[in-house]
């Protein structure tokens, strides 16, 4: 793994991998990855497929991001700003719903998630743009839906070791794409920060620092 790819891994890759691995993993499951072109989502698509998911659906906001999700291997992509997400997921799963949702923004998507999960399904949330938030309690409890939360900084030693071991094997086999949208130098650091802050890039911006001799 080169330095640029290594810079992309860190928190996003471990977050994606734990979201896929937790509670027994996703073998033979249908998984919806919210934000499938994001730093975490792009890895989560690939990792879910590598670890046995039967079908991976991604939700994204733009056609350009849809292409990124497809390049990561998503079996289907829904553009949630122009398509009815709940209806499309129902169609893609023949009305059954998904087994697991890997969720980047629970506060925004909680109501839709309760409709898209199968009975007994699980939403694994690692982020929310809204806090505090309202949850659809009765739709959740009436269908035995599960909400799981985690932040990668507070993983147990066992969970962290498991994720590191699986990630090492994936990297050794060269099966992961690393979504690098732009490479910049320290001379362009102001512009680089502005682009990240303004969300102009679909992917990671990597700063290349010359090696000192």
Q: What residue ranges belong to the model's regions?
A:
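C-terminal capping/lid region of NAD(P)-dependent oxidoreductase domains
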Residues: 95, 172-182, 190-213
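Mid-domain Rossmann-like dinucleotide-binding core that forms the NAD(H)/NADP(H) cofactor-binding site
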Residues: 4-82
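Short amphipathic alpha-helix with an adjacent loop that forms part of the alpha/beta core around
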Residues: 84-95
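N-terminal Rossmann-like NAD(P) cofactor-binding module of classical short-chain dehydrogenase/reductase
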Residues: 99-102, 124
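A generic alpha-to-beta junction signature in SAM-dependent methyltransferases
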Residues: 24-25, 93, 105, 117
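Glycine-rich phosphate-binding loop and adjacent beta-alpha segment
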Residues: 60, 108-175, 209-213
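Local beta-strand N-terminus motif with an aromatic residue
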Residues: 28, 74, 97-98, 140, ...
């Amino acid at each position: 793994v080169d330095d640029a790819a290594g810079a992309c891994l860190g928190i996003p890759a471990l977050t994606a991998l734990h979201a896929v691995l937790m509670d027994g993993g996703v073998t033979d499951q249908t998984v919806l990855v919210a934000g499938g072109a994001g730093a975490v989502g792009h890895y989560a698509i690939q990792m879910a497929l590598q670890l046995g998911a039967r079908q991976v659906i991604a939700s994204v906001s733009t056609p350009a991001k849809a292409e990124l999700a497809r390049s990561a291997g998503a079996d289907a992509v829904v553009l949630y700003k122009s398509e009815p997400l709940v209806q499309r997921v129902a169609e893609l799963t023949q009305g059954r719903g998904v087994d697991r949702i890997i969720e980047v923004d629970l506060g925004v998507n909680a109501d839709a998630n309760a409709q898209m999960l199968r009975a007994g399904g699980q939403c694994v949330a690692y982020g929310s743009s809204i806090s505090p938030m309202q949850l659809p309690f009765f739709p959740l409890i009436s269908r035995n839906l599960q909400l799981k939360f985690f932040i990668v900084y507070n993983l147990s030693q066992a969970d962290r070791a498991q994720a590191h071991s699986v990630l090492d094997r994936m990297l050794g086999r060269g099966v992961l794409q690393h979504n690098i949208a732009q490479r910049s130098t320290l001379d362009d650091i102001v512009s680089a920060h502005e682009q990240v802050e303004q969300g102009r890039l679909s992917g990671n911006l990597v700063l290349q620092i010359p090696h000192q001799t």
